[in-house]
A protein has these predicted regions:
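Bacterial N-terminal signal peptides that target proteins for export
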Residues: 2-14
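N-terminal signal peptide c-region/cleavage motif recognized by signal peptidases
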Residues: 22-24
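Acidic, polar ligand-binding/catalytic clefts
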Residues: 76-132
Length: 287
């Protein structure tokens, strides 16, 4: 039998305690996630719950959703490292990238986000094309929304309509579902929003489809992504990326998460995907 001196025994015990404490601390690490509030808080929480549980298992850390009040707060939260990962629209990513001096990294996006679109909706039978909007009331979503403001504004400008001059009134509802509600209730005659929220409302029959219809669908553009701060360790960033890329519709868990995220699958993303949106933002005077 090997006998240790009291000093060596104490040293061994302290080493063991430090290792155990380190393992415990690692297990109790908090990984914070946020998302732009492009839908109601209850809907965002419902969509996030299974994904957070999945990420907890993959990362070996407690994953917590941190809600924010507006798009700007989501940008500031990631730029200032108050959260570890954020769900951004294309334009909010650009804002975060500019605000941080290039210190944020888009890791994944849905396959759908490689060719995302917006829709213009109306309850007015006389509106059949974008040019028919002249002199009407129009609602965008948030001013920082890619699919609910920036890209619809860009396509209006391409059609020869200046939202700041050619409409009777321009409103900002703050969220895609709120835009649908504004059009359905008659508060505005038309609205622009994210196609995936529109399709979900149609599928779930959340409004009278006989009253509100799509009259214009935009050409495709890059949109949403999951973004992290560049200071995140490369190993953790890779683990996180692989967790998303591993999601599969072949498993019950994967199908549930992908359905809630309205995704076929997740694919790698990169900064260059959003150069077009950055150019549109600068052209519109929003950057």
């Amino acid at each position: 039998m090997i006998r240790l001196s009291p000093s060596r025994t104490l040293k061994a015990l302290l080493t063991c305690a430090m290792l155990c404490f380190g393992a415990l601390s690692h297990a109790q690490q908090l990984f914070r996630v946020t998302a732009i509030p492009d839908e109601s808080p209850t809907e965002l929480a419902r969509k996030a719950a299974p994904l957070l549980k999945y990420l907890e298992a993959k990362l070996g850390a407690k994953v917590e959703f941190t809600p924010v009040t507006d798009y700007a707060a989501a940008v500031e939260a990631l730029v200032n490292k108050k959260v570890d990962m954020a769900w951004f629209g294309g334009f909010t990513f650009v804002q975060a990238n500019v605000r941080s001096g290039g210190k944020v990294i888009p890791i994944v996006q849905r396959e759908e986000d490689e060719r995302f679109r917006s829709v213009f909706i109306t309850s007015d039978d006389a509106i059949k094309s974008l040019v028919d909007l002249k002199g009407k009331d129009l609602s965008f979503g948030s001013q920082s929304s890619t699919s609910g403001h920036l890209m619809p504004r860009s396509f209006l400008l391409q059609a020869g309509l200046n939202p700041d001059k050619d409409f009777r009134r321009v409103a900002y509802s703050g969220a895609h579902d709120a835009t649908i509600a504004a059009v359905a209730s008659g508060k505005v005659q038309a609205g622009a929003l994210n196609i995936s929220v529109w399709e979900k409302f149609v599928t779930d029959k959340k409004f009278d489809a006989g009253k509100v219809r799509v009259f214009f669908t935009t050409p495709p553009y890059f949109d949403y992504n999951w973004t992290v701060h560049a200071d995140m360790p490369a190993a953790q960033r890779e683990k996180l990326t692989q967790a998303f890329l591993s999601l599969s519709r072949d498993t019950t868990e994967g199908k549930e998460i992908l359905d809630l995220q309205r995704a076929t699958r997740f694919v790698p993303s990169k900064v260059d995907n959003y150069k077009g949106i950055e150019a549109a933002g600068r052209s519109a005077g929003l950057l």
